[in-house]
Amino acid sequence: MNMGMSDALFPHRLSRRSLLRSALAGGTGLAATYLLACSDGDGGSTPGATDQPGDGEQVRFRWAQLAPAAPLPPARRDHSLVTDGASVYLFGGQANEPRGDLWVYSIADNAWTNATIEGGPGARFGHNAVWDTNRSRMIVFGGQASNAFFNDVWEYAPAEGRWFQAKVGTEAPSPAPRYGAAGAIDSAGALVVSHGFTDQGRFSDSWRYDPANATWADITPADTEEKPIERCLMRGVWDTVRDRLLMYGGQTTDTPFLDDLWALASTGWQQLPRSPNPDARNLYAMVYDDRRKRAILIGGRTPAGQMNDVWLFDATDEFWTPTTVRTSRPTPRYGHDAAWVSETSTILVFGGNDGLEDLNDIWQLTPPASDLEPIAPTPTP
């Protein structure tokens, strides 16, 4: 594939995939070598991979463990983590028992504050939480505590230091209580949740909550052949490229690990490209990079055990890319959560379980400035 002079001078006009293919074919007139951030997908370093195009080109993802001073949140898993850009809000989860505490992490100060107050949601885990930018509040939905499942909605207002329970009408339609649903905030500032389960079984329905008037709407698409089966224990992110919910993997009856990627838009469900893709898994963390328009999946539990790999899903070209990290990294884990900090283009990851114990460490993942960067100048003949 040959590029014109305009494309050669301005490679950002090309998709990352087409530029990589052209570079590998030797058909570019670029004065620099561009490499796509990817690897063999095992989450670890691959010796010599930088010399093998297509099997682990050079990567610039960096992990760094943060070391805030005490006090620190107790170890936990199945919690929520959201951010307003300056602070990160950690709520709930479970260790030996469900937790109902609220902790606030200052990004600038690298410090935790226990913000637990009376009058908030009861202890729970496996709930959904999002940050409502329009109203500067954290919205919490559902979850589980022991044998109890919830479908209540709560909002935390940091400016007031208070919790508010949404007054959803008892006669109005609303989702059944559930745990482990996919959830994200859409472009209009509404909470979208899909699937999940209770002790009565798993769900395949989808709902949209409008915080402005505290109302739910059932947005489950009409029955079609193309739709995800009932499932739970997965995450959701909102793709701003096509205005849709992205949901990967999870667990269903008799199949503890799924590896399919689905998108829910106003037109219904669509299954997205599958190969290459992350191993089948549940209880992973996933965020959305709103600058580069991609979902970033981190770790989780697979048939082989806990993982600490990182995968990217390009929302524009719709393909997965495995990444590798050349620095120390978190132990493999599941039940952790992550928050995308747009202001610094970084990801913060907290807690989870490594298969032996619950954790309370916090890590920062820094993506490369660009997936395609000049590595070294190439002499022009």
Description of each model-found segment:
Residues 1-18, 22-33, 38:
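N-terminal secretory signal peptides
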Residues 42-381:
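Kelch-like beta-propeller repeat domains
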